């Protein structure tokens, strides 16, 4: 009899939970419609992989790309809608979050064509690769809209776990295995540090987990200037610093860049930063509203260290991927200026604008590296000597992307940095902007050194890899070159027509 009653109670409780979940999905599902498209794409991929043979491989790429394009379309149709909080306060939809989601989707869409020939040449498993890309993108999108500490952590771990799996995707490569172990250990440690900071925030606010409710809780408990909040700020800053590869928390970045498959590096180099920036802006601007001076100082120190160490160490690198790793550390130092400036002086708009340009510049560079690596089997900088004599189109494309990363006019990188530094100067960050200008000039040196090698390689400098380079036509039909052309054009002309981009970025409503 007791067992019968307990069984009935269990059934009733399960039914209530199911009905509540169904109610949430039915009435709040429209707020995560772009994410639902990706989930549907994931299910389709699994079904096709289980029920078809190798001849249907093009369908896998088509479904992945279509899912990303449809998700972008859904985001654009939702633009300018009123900010909404859904799923009992766990998720927030507004223009500011959607811009970061758009950047993640844009990067993922461009990375699919970058991967096609690489996967075919290296004979990697295709379905799992696409599943990890879709799931990581899904985690990044949920992270952009997460409105409480638990959802933030779950979305962050969803993205991180897929990143670890992608990093070690070439299981037979010793470098890839080493990179995965370092990435996993450092990523796990940084997540633990971040959660420890969350626990201090949770306790100081009286047990609140929603971001805005944490602020109200801190006011009610009079803990907004307490030592507990300072401890939370330090640990959360360190955790986010690891995710953003800010110096001195950048040690894992060069090894992961060098050991991971190049399309994976291209994907992670942008999406991880965009997702972490979305998290940083919300965490620092809302729960730590009363500690703005403290987190401004912390971020200034990290930005200065990143700009100096990233660009100085990049000069000494002999591997193209390691050079881009240290370059990315310097680049994120520039972007931090936008977070420090905030919404009042166009800081967030300049950060968003520069990240859009950075996607084009960075993915264009990686597209060139992937093509060169498939044709030569190396990513050593000295093996690029004389590339212009063998493949002028590839050499010119790589040169344009590197010049844009360096910030030379009239390319997009120049206008992006100019707007970013101008906003910082207007906000009174004179020392930080001065360091940014000096290190940006320093970065031009190692970019120009590579470009000089591309264009004017002497006979004694040309390595056997270049002598055996397969001469390709000016334009071929592979998808890597298609992505490369799109990114090179964007890196060239976006800066000239950046006023509409700035207007859209400034029009984002930073409302929570």
UniProtKB/Swiss-Prot annotation:
Keyword Protein biosynthesis attributed: no
Signal peptide residues on this chain, from the entry's feature table: none
Reaction equations catalysed: a plastoquinone + NADH + (n+1) H(+)(in) = a plastoquinol + NAD(+) + n H(+)(out); a plastoquinone + NADPH + (n+1) H(+)(in) = a plastoquinol + NADP(+) + n H(+)(out)
Predominant cellular place of this UniProt entry's protein: plastid
Compartment annotation: Plastid, Chloroplast thylakoid membrane
Gene Ontology biological-process entries: ATP synthesis coupled electron transport; photosynthesis, light reaction
Alphabetical list of InterPro entries matching this protein: NADH-Q_OxRdtase_suN/2, ND/Mrp_TM, Ndh2_N
Plastid keyword on record: yes
GO molecular function: NADH dehydrogenase (ubiquinone) activity; quinone binding
Residues annotated as transmembrane: 31-51, 57-77, 99-119, 124-144, 149-169, 183-203, 229-249, 261-281, 295-315, 323-343, 354-374, 395-415, 418-438, 484-504
Keyword terms: Chloroplast, Membrane, NAD, NADP, Plastid, Plastoquinone, Quinone, Thylakoid, Translocase, Transmembrane, Transmembrane helix, Transport
Enzyme class name: translocase
Domain of life of the organism encoding this protein: Eukaryota
Topology class, membrane: Multi-pass membrane protein
E.C. no: 7.1.1.-
Function: NDH shuttles electrons from NAD(P)H:plastoquinone, via FMN and iron-sulfur (Fe-S) centers, to quinones in the photosynthetic chain and possibly in a chloroplast respiratory chain. The immediate electron acceptor for the enzyme in this species is believed to be plastoquinone. Couples the redox reaction to proton translocation, and thus conserves the redox energy in a proton gradient.
Subunit composition and interactions: NDH is composed of at least 16 different subunits, 5 of which are encoded in the nucleus.
Name of the protein: NAD(P)H-quinone oxidoreductase subunit 2 A, chloroplastic
Species this chain originates from: Arabidopsis thaliana
Gene that encodes the chain: ndhB1
